[in-house]
């Protein structure tokens, strides 16, 4: 029997007034063409905070201090091949201006009204952004019966 191990990922919510920063995925093999948040996997031996800081700098060129990150939501989800635990962090201040640092994996950036996300936003991202307004935890594709 193989040992079950979910993948841990971080999502970074960067706000500007009532808008959030989205990036459009490309050349990744997963949801290419769809809008999402800056995000990535937590590497072996890395804390979730460190991963969020690293991903923000790698993907959008901003520098975030650990004290500027607030954990606002946890999503436990199952995709076709993997199970994820996604930690969603909201950013309260950063240095720099968001720019597309990975044009090979990101077609562009945009600021979007949270209440009017693009039609082609990743479905689980839309669900999580809506759900986190009233809850701190959600699950998708899993047995939720108690």
Locate the predicted segments by residue.
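A short coil-to-beta-strand element that immediately follows conserved catalytic motifs
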Residues: 63-72
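NUDIX/MutT-family hydrolases
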Residues: 100-133
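Conserved Nudix-box catalytic region and its N-terminal flanking loop in Nudix hydrolases
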Residues: 19-58
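A short beta-turn/loop motif at secondary-structure boundaries
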Residues: 29, 77-81, 103-104, 146
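Active-site-adjacent beta-strand/loop module that shapes the phosphate/pyrophosphate-binding cleft
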Residues: 16, 75-98, 128-132, 136
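Conserved N-terminal beta-strand and adjoining loop/helix that marks the start
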Residues: 1-21, 72-74, 90
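Acidic/histidine-enriched, glycine/proline-rich intrinsically disordered or flexible terminal extensions
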Residues: 134-146
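Short connector loops at helix/strand junctions that flank enzyme active sites
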Residues: 7, 15, 32, 37, ...
């Amino acid at each position: 029997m193989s040992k079950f191990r979910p993948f841990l990922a971080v999502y970074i919510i960067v706000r500007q007034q009532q808008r959030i920063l989205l990036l459009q995925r490309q050349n990744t093999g997963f949801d290419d063409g769809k809008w999402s948040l800056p995000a990535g996997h937590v590497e072996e031996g890395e804390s979730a905070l460190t991963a969020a800081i690293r991903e923000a700098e790698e993907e959008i060129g901003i520098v975030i201090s650990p004290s500027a990150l607030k954990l606002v939501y946890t999503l436990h989800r199952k995709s076709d091949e993997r199970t994820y635990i996604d930690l969603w962090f909201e950013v309260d201040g950063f240095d720099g201006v968001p720019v597309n640092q990975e044009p090979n994996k990101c077609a562009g950036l945009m600021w979007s009204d949270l209440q009017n996300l693009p039609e082609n936003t990743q479905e689980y991202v839309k669900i999580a952004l809506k759900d986190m307004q009233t809850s701190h935890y959600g699950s998708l594709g899993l047995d939720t019966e108690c």
